[in-house]
């Protein structure tokens, strides 16, 4: 089980949450105890009543709704205490079967009847279209002056001069957090200390711990011309840290893509294995809900994939274009960087992001990004890697 799935399991399959919902369902059940057939979902001729109770009351007590996103699209979700997870008919079936079976005496019987005799209770078309709509809800997002980090034990609100922590239940009315964006660790306020820029920029090579910090600084080392020793370049680290911070803060102020390339690029050569993907892909995937895209899908050779954003979901916070090829067509991203973002999914479906709400973007490349002029320059924050 992945860490993200582990959080979903512990959060939504919580025994107290299920027990509370089951008590409400027992107070007005959608099933009856038939004198001949035993426990059944509905009596003869009373299907409409049972359907209404099941879809309108039972499923909503378990937190299942159709959430409206971007004012035009509905997505099936489960809600609990300010956290939402995107679901499908299989998840709903598994959760309902698990929860109902916990009801003493009749739970197993009613699940058996629903599964064998009345399988339409779990039919994809019926269950997803019958979920009740949930309107006027929006996810927590960063603003110009505030950033949020979501941990298993609550929400961290970060301003320039303060850090506050509160539970998911204390979110503002009408706001929620996607479960995919919850970091799989608890927040420890005792680890927070006042930021010291001089200490942050200083070479950490001789200090213990801070492994990722030192990894990033190692990318900013180059050999001196005199004795060929590795020398730390503080200005390059500033550029890398600035780009990294821009990606972590999800407010779109400057519409740019962070690009990490080798410093000494030579035409016709590919200088890989220097750690660029570790920084822009592996590192950020542990801090943001990330989708990695093979950057070779976007090239001037006409290799165009209409479903390049297939795996992007409403909860996605960052898109990594990994290992851009020598003819990476950066122009394809122009409108996606400065405007809205439309993501087409295979087998139907589309997700649209407003220009302020779309995921941040970064790319790593062993080659120069082709293109000249302000349209290219204004959309790029370039960080060079000098470890070769």
Where do the PLM segments sit?
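P-loop NTPase catalytic core of nucleic-acid-dependent motor ATPases
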Residues: 63-91, 157-315, 381-383
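AAA+/SF3 P-loop NTPase mechanochemical coupling elements
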Residues: 308-314, 345-364
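Walker B catalytic acidic pair
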Residues: 321-324
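Conserved catalytic/switch belt of AAA+ P-loop NTPases
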Residues: 329-353
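Short, polar loop motifs at secondary-structure junctions
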Residues: 365-369
């Amino acid at each position: 089980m992945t860490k993200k799935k582990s959080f979903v399991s512990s959060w939504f399959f919580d025994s107290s949450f299920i027990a509370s919902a089951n008590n409400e369902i027992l107070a007005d059940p959608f099933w009856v105890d038939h004198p001949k057939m035993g426990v059944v979902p509905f009596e003869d001729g009373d299907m409409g009543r049972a359907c209404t109770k099941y879809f309108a009351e039972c499923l909503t007590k378990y937190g299942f709704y159709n959430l409206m996103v971007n004012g035009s699209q509905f997505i099936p979700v489960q809600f609990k205490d300010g956290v939402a997870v995107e679901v499908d008919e299989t998840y709903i079936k598994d959760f309902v079967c698990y929860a109902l079976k916990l009801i003493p005496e009749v739970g197993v019987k009613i699940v058996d009847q629903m599964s064998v005799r009345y399988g339409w209770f779990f039919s994809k078309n019926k269950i997803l279209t019958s979920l009740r709509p949930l309107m006027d809800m929006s996810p927590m997002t960063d603003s110009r002056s505030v950033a949020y980090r979501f941990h298993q034990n609550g929400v961290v609100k970060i301003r320039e001069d303060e850090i506050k922590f509160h539970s998911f239940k204390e979110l503002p009315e009408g706001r929620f957090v996607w479960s995919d964006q919850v970091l799989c660790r608890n927040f420890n306020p005792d680890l927070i200390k006042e930021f010291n820029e001089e200490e942050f920029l200083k070479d950490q090579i001789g200090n213990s711990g801070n492994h990722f910090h030192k990894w990033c600084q190692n990318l900013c080392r180059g050999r001196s011309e005199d004795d060929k020793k590795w020398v730390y370049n503080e200005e390059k680290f500033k550029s890398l840290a600035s780009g990294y911070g821009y990606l972590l803060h999800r407010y779109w102020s400057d519409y740019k893509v962070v690009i990490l390339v080798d410093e000494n690029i030579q035409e016709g050569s590919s200088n890989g294995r220097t750690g660029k993907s570790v920084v822009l892909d592996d590192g950020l995937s542990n801090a943001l809900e990330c989708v990695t895209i093979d950057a070779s899908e976007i090239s001037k050779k006409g290799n165009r994939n209409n479903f390049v954003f297939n795996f992007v979901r409403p909860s996605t916070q960052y898109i990594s274009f990994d290992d851009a090829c020598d003819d990476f067509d950066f122009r394809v991203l122009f409108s996606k960087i400065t405007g809205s973002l439309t993501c087409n999914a295979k087998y139907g479906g589309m997700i649209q992001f407003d220009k302020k709400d779309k995921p941040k973007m970064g790319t790593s490349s062993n080659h120069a990004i082709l293109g000249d002029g302000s349209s290219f320059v204004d959309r790029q924050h370039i960080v060079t890697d000098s470890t070769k």
